[in-house]
Amino acid sequence: MLTIKANLRIYHKKGATRRLRKQNKCPAVIYNRGQEPSIPIILNQNDILHPEAVIQLYKNNVILLFIENQQPITVKVQELQYHPFKSKLIHIDFTRV
């Protein structure tokens, strides 16, 4: 099982996500089942683009996210969005398992 560290994302607008990407971070969202609100998070590009991590992301395996000051969350990848010509992720959507 792949484990990734994440931080909560406070700012959600376009300019804030651009600044994150320039800092080698990747914005992501964890979608919950039912009425619970989604959780916006920030991931480090180096943690995600590690060769072992890429394989786990594409296999659609269960991933354990450690978010600061919270219980670990088990998720699956719903969607990956890559930059058109750079080898960077633009955004990831997770679904809680």
From Swiss-Prot:
Segments traversing the membrane: none
Annotated NCBIfam families: PRK05943.1
Organism for this UniProt entry: Blochmanniella pennsylvanica (strain BPEN)
Name of this protein: Large ribosomal subunit protein bL25
Keywords: Ribonucleoprotein, Ribosomal protein, RNA-binding, rRNA-binding
Subunit-level organization: Part of the 50S ribosomal subunit; part of the 5S rRNA/L5/L18/L25 subcomplex. Contacts the 5S rRNA. Binds to the 5S rRNA independently of L5 and L18.
Gene Ontology MF term list: 5S rRNA binding; structural constituent of ribosome
Cross-referenced InterPro entries: Rbsml_bL25/Gln-tRNA_synth_N, Ribosomal_bL25/Gln-tRNA_synth, Ribosomal_bL25_short, Ribosomal_L25_dom
A single cellular component GO annotation: ribosome
Family, similarity comment: Belongs to the bacterial ribosomal protein bL25 family.
BP terms from Gene Ontology: translation
Domain of life: Bacteria
Task performed by this protein: This is one of the proteins that binds to the 5S RNA in the ribosome where it forms part of the central protuberance.
Pfam families: Ribosomal_L25p
